[in-house]
């Protein structure tokens, strides 16, 4: 008896693969992808809104013959992402009161000095916001030569808005808004600052006392991103 006869002349039927589970999986993955990207865009939009500062109002009584200072150009939050941060000891900052809270500028300045940055000038009132009506966390203002210093300061004050003005030196201003809290760098920011300090100490100091920065500081890009990944 042949094998076909033994099986009763029955040919095994081809079992079709059901595409439904695969389709369901593709749909689920698509929904998850849309959810993740929506969350990313929403988070970016939220933090942009949270760090945005209102424009200054004109002073009620301006000194005769004296033009109000220019507010500068507001930059995007990621505008300094490709800029190497400066060593903290080479950052010179002036803290300004733009919210009307007494003594806050002096207290914040002391916190910054404790973090390793230096004083550019004594804390004072903000000439750009003479009515003390800055309703945001604050602004970091700098010129073309102070981008590295501003990058370092943005690690300490990640919720401050970046503003580029026409100053020619490397000093940086930190103007405090009504939503400003205090200086609280996260773990990643502390690591970056420590690495910058360590790298700066290893750089040669030529005659004249001014250290020459050779090369780029070996700072991990993911640490820089994490240092500013905060809730504002």
Locate predicted features.
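Intrinsically disordered, low-complexity segments enriched in small/polar residues
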Residues: 6, 63, 70, 74, ...
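Generic detector of well-ordered alpha-helical segments enriched in charged/polar residues
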Residues: 72, 150-154, 190-193, 197
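Terminal domain-initiation and capping elements
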Residues: 2-55, 221, 227-230
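Extracytoplasmic low-complexity, Pro/Thr/Ser/Ala/Gly-rich segments
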Residues: 44-113, 121-123, 127, 228, ...
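Intrinsically disordered, low-complexity regions
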Residues: 4, 8-11, 71-72, 77-80, ...
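Short, charged N-terminal helix-start/capping segments
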Residues: 17-25, 74-85, 206-213
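Extracellularly exposed regions in secreted/surface proteins, prominently low-complexity, repeat-rich
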Residues: 47, 178, 182-232
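BRCT (BRCA1 C-terminal) domain core and associated BRCT-interaction motifs
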Residues: 4, 8-25, 35-39, 107, ...
């Amino acid at each position: 008896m042949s094998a076909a006869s033994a099986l009763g002349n029955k040919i095994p039927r081809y079992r079709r693969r059901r595409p439904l589970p695969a389709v369901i999986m593709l749909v689920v993955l698509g929904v998850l992808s849309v959810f993740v990207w929506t969350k990313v865009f929403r988070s970016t939009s939220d933090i942009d809104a949270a760090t945005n500062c209102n424009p200054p109002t004109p002073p009620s009584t301006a000194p005769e013959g004296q033009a109000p200072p220019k507010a500068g150009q507001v930059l995007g939050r990621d505008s300094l992402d490709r800029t190497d941060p400066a060593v903290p000891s080479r950052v010179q900052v002036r803290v300004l009161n733009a919210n009307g809270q007494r003594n806050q500028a002096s207290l914040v300045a002391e916190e910054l000095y404790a973090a390793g940055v230096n004083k550019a000038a004594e804390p004072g009132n903000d000439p750009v916001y003479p009515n003390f009506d800055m309703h945001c966390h604050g602004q970091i203002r700098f010129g073309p030569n102070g981008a590295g210093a501003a990058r370092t300061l943005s690690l300490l004050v990640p919720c401050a808005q970046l503003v580029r003005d026409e100053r020619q030196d490397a000093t940086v201003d930190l103007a405090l808004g009504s939503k400003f809290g205090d200086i609280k760098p996260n773990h990643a920011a502390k690591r970056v600052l420590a690495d910058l300090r360590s790298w700066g100490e290893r750089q040669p100091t030529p005659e004249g006392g001014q250290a020459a920065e050779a090369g780029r500081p070996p700072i991990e890009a993911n640490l820089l991103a994490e240092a500013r990944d905060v809730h504002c």
